[in-house]
Amino acid sequence: MKFGKIVLLTNILLVPTASLAGGSHDHDHGNKAGSGLIETEFGKYDPQMHPTVTIEIRMSDDMKFTPATIQVKQGDIVEFIHANEGQLMHEFVLGTLQSLNDHADEMKQNPSMSHDKPFMVHVAPGETGTNTWQFTESGVFHFGCLIPGHYEAGMRGTVIVGS
């Protein structure tokens, strides 16, 4: 009977510990260990790739990204480092203009929706987040903070991918 009590006590002690392991969700939805290969019309993510370019982007409560225009070459693997210098939560979502507009509309309906793709990063106030993305096609692509009200206030930018 002692063995049964020890197992029960161990399970009671481990359950709260396990729940604390995921405790404070920092909303960094960048390079997820479980993310596999993802390909889109604006590029791809592969967990095996290594950055060839690093770009720092500052996010602010005046609803701006700095820089708001980024130039890269087709094939570049970019590590984005996002610094939220404001007091509000901000996010960085890459996409086409249409995909960003669609996602912004979805966010109005469900502002707490999950962001689990490697082209999306939530960054808490005063924090830094990262994500890595390869631009496989030349063209003009977009990014924005799709938290309701931010995108509409002008928190958006452009990625120009040259060949």
Protein language model regions, located:
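N-terminal pre-domain segments of enzymes
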Residues: 26-50
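Short aromatic-acidic-glycine turn motif
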Residues: 98-109
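Bacterial N-terminal signal peptides that target proteins for export
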Residues: 1-8
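Short beta-strand and strand-turn-strand segments in soluble, beta-rich domains
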Residues: 108-116
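Extracellular/periplasmic metallocenter environments
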Residues: 22-35, 64, 117-163
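N-terminal edge beta-strand
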Residues: 42, 46-77
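Beta-strand cores of secreted/periplasmic/IMS beta-sandwich domains, seen most often
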Residues: 57, 68-94, 129-137
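N-terminal signal peptide c-region/cleavage motif recognized by signal peptidases
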Residues: 16-18
